[in-house]
């Protein structure tokens, strides 16, 4: 059987960089990983509660974390200014306080910045979230996939593949459906491929969404 490797990990050091950057002694490694997970969960939960638009669409493309001895720098990359949390300055300060409490680490400063992405539909996380929202609203999975591909094409991507697995349209037997448009060269290391996997809870059960986007070739 074919062995599937994560496209992001496969390209680390060439076309992809680490989303979390820090150094630790082996005995502290697991604690740092758990800390990263707490930061990501806390930010996503806060944004979900305090969004300007109550559609359930967070629009977070990715989170970048950099740690130093006395500082944790978190960068939130978002797709649209309409999805910014209420009152940017006050909201970021509240978010920073929430994350600091969750980490229970007062000897390090926490700095959070928000960066807007120029072409949001070039980001697989945002497209996956869009598809998930459509599926929750009982839109046909094929229609949701085709619309996501249209949005990606408008962002001038070179290729995209969208895959959904589970009890599609409420059928009793789970299956996998996918659509590809353009080139998605997964075996070419110099090809910059963005990838994400996303789970969505629907009335028929859990569906898994995977998206590969061919951005450029170096």
Swiss-Prot record:
Subunit-structure text: Part of the 30S ribosomal subunit.
A single GO molecular function term of this UniProt record: rRNA binding
Name of this protein: Small ribosomal subunit protein uS3c
One CC-aspect GO term: cytosolic small ribosomal subunit
InterPro entries (alphabetical): KH_dom-like_a/b, KH_dom_type_2, KH_sf_prok-type, Ribosomal_S3_C_sf, Ribosomal_uS3_bac-typ, Ribosomal_uS3_C, Ribosomal_uS3_CS
Keyword Nucleotide-binding: no
Pfam families: Ribosomal_S3_C
Organism for this UniProt entry: Amborella trichopoda
């Amino acid at each position: 059987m074919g062995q599937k490797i994560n496209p992001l990990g496969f390209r680390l050091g060439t076309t992809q960089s680490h989303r979390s950057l820090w150094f630790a002694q082996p005995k502290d490694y697991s604690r740092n990983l758990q800390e990263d997970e707490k930061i990501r969960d806390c930010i996503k939960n806060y944004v979900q509660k305090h969004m300007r638009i109550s559609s359930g669409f967070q629009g977070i493309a990715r989170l970048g974390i950099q740690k130093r001895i006395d500082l944790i720098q978190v960068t939130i990359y978002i797709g649209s200014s309409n999805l910014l949390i209420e009152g940017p300055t006050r909201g970021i300060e509240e978010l920073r306080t929430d994350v600091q409490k969750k980490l229970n680490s007062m000897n390090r400063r926490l700095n959070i910045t928000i960066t807007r992405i120029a072409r949001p539909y070039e980001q697989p996380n945002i497209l996956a979230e869009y598809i998930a929202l459509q599926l929750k609203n009982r839109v046909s999975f094929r229609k949701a996939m085709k619309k996501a591909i249209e949005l990606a094409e408008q962002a001038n991507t070179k290729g995209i593949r969208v895959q959904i697995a589970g009890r599609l349209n409420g059928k009793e037997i789970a299956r996998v459906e996918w659509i590809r448009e353009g080139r998605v060269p997964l075996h070419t290391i110099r090809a910059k491929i963005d990838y994400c996997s996303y789970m969505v809870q629907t009335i028929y059960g859990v569906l898994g969404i995977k998206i590969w986007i061919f951005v450029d070739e170096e």
